[in-house]
Amino acid sequence: MSAGRTGRTGRTGRTGKDIVGAHRGAPDVIGADHGPPFVQPGPDPSNPLHVQPIQFVGSFPDPQVRLEPELPEIALIGRSNVGKSSLLNVLVGRPGLARVSGSPGKTTLLNFYRLPEFYLVDLPGYGFARAGKGARAGYRKLVNDYLRTRTSLAGVVWLLDIRHQPSTDDLEMQRLLAESGRPVLAVLTKADKLTRSALPVRLHELSEALGLQQDQVEITSSHSKTGIVELATSIVAAAAGENV
C-alpha cells in the first residue's frame, strides 16, 4: 500500500450481542467479549487469514467508536455491488461471515471484524444510484471522518470492478483517499467475468485511468479465488506496518 496514492457520541449499532454501558457524550468502548465466539480457521493454510480465528465485533454508526483491545485496522471500501462482502468472506475463509446485502446502498454502518493482531473494517458501499442527496452527504461525512480521524487505521483496500472504467463516484473516492494520506491498495474484483487474455489489458487500462503503476493494483476473484492469497498476504503486511 502506498500512502495517499489513489491519486463521540454514545450511539451504538448492531453487534453479535447487545452493547451495554454506552455513555452519553463519550465514544463506545467495545471489548472482545461483546461479540460471538471466534470463528475457527478455514481450510487453506497458504492463506495467512485462514489460519487465524476471526470474530464479528459489531456494526456502528460512529467513526470514533473505541474498541478494546485497540489494534491496527485495515478498511475495505468500494462501490455498492463491487463484491465487497463476498470478497471478505473468501479472504478469511468464512462463508456467510459478512452478509451479502439484498439492498445495496442501504447500509450506513461500519462493520468491525477482529483477528488476533488487527481489525478488518467493512465500510458501507458508495455510489448507489437511488441514494438521495441527504444519504450521499451522510455517507461522505461518515467515510471522510473515518478516513481522516481514525488513529488506528493502518491502510485501505479500495475495490473496483475490473469490467468497468472508474465512475464519477470512484474518482471522488480516489480524491478522498488521497486527501486522507492513508496507505491505499487498489484491488480489482470479479476477474472471473473476463477471459484470461483480457485481464492484463484491463489491468493496464484501469491502472492508467487511475494514475497508478500496475504493481500498485491487485486482481482478484471471489469465485475463482484468483489473487486471494496474495491480497490476504498484503493485508497482513499492511496491518503490521509494512509498505506493500
PLM features: what roles do these ranges have?
Residues 2-16, 21, 25, 31, ...:
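Small-residue-biased low-complexity repeat regions
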Residues 70, 96, 109, 135-139, ...:
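Helical mechanochemical/support elements of P-loop NTPase systems and associated helical scaffolds
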Residues 61, 106, 118, 125-127, ...:
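Conserved nucleotide-binding/hydrolysis micro-motifs of P-loop NTPases
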Residues 51-63, 193-244:
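Canonical P-loop GTPase G-domain recognition
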Residues 66-68, 102-111, 124-154, 162-176:
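Switch II of P-loop NTPase G domains
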Residues 144-215:
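Conserved C-terminal guanine-recognition region of P-loop GTPase G domains, centered on the G4
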Residues 17, 84, 190-193:
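A general lysine-centric signal
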Residues 3, 29-130, 240:
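Conserved G1/Walker A P-loop phosphate-binding module
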